[in-house]
């Protein structure tokens, strides 16, 4: 996040007193000080029983994005716990064994962390620096754009009451429609009063003129392979969780959903 905003060299070392007192130097995850005016973002000095806040928490607070990040980024609270409480307590908090956490490790994460830790200086143009910048840019764009995306979903979408007694959220095709407007539909449902009743999402297919249909929260009471042989369905995943159709009429889309319901 910081290098996306300030594209400068990263030095991996302990800060000097001069660094900590210089607001033109961002000191992150070291130094024993949290002072946004001086651009110091360390959490290690906090009491053991304090709320789990790590360096990214403090940087997000600095940018005014922390509350939105907690709402829209499911991984953030887990990262805070892992960084401040360790894997054993984090596993207990999640209700899983520590060994299960280890099985979720990504080799991409491992390599990036190892390569970052292996250098004392990272500069513009180097792979690690550029990847870090991309992550910061994408996170900032995601957080600042999510509110607008949810507003777009609320403005465009409509709820369908299905014959099988559940709800479906439908987004019509309108122009202009942002490329990823449908990606906010799941979050919109979770924030609505109908999250327990909703079983599917229907949204414009970005690769065609029809619509995509997918399970909400992987509700297996919908089985889209049941409509895979329909003339206007050109794709139905073998696992049954998604289908794509050239149909554009609401009545036909509802018919396909009714056919896919297995209860």
Short names for language-model regions:
Residues 152-158, 194-201:
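Short small/polar-residue motifs
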């Amino acid at each position: 996040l910081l290098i996306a905003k300030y594209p400068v060299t990263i030095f991996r070392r302990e800060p000097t007193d001069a660094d900590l007192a210089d607001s033109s130097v961002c000191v992150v995850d070291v130094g024993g000080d949290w002072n946004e005016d001086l651009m110091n973002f360390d959490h290690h000095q906090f009491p053991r029983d304090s709320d789990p806040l790590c360096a990214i928490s403090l940087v997000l607070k600095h940018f005014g994005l922390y509350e939105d990040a907690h709402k829209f980024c499911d991984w953030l609270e887990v990262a805070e716990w892992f960084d401040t409480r360790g894997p054993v307590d984090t596993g207990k908090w999640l209700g899983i064994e520590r060994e299960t956490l280890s099985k979720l490790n990504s080799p991409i994460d491992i390599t990036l962390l190892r390569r970052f830790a292996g250098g004392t200086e990272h500069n513009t143009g180097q792979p690690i620096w550029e990847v870090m910048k991309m992550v910061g840019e994408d996170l900032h764009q995601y957080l600042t754009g999510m509110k607008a995306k949810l507003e777009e979903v609320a403005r465009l979408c409509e709820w369908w009451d299905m014959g099988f007694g559940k709800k479906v959220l439908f987004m019509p095709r309108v122009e202009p429609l942002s490329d990823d407007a449908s990606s906010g539909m799941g979050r919109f449902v979770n924030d609505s009063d109908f999250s327990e009743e909703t079983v599917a999402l229907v949204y414009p297919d970005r690769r065609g003129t029809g619509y995509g249909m997918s399970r909400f929260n992987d509700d297996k009471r919908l089985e889209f392979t049941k409509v895979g042989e329909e003339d206007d369905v050109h794709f139905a995943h073998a696992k049954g969780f998604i289908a794509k159709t050239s149909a554009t009429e609401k009545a036909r889309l509802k018919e396909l959903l009714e056919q896919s319901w297995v209860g």
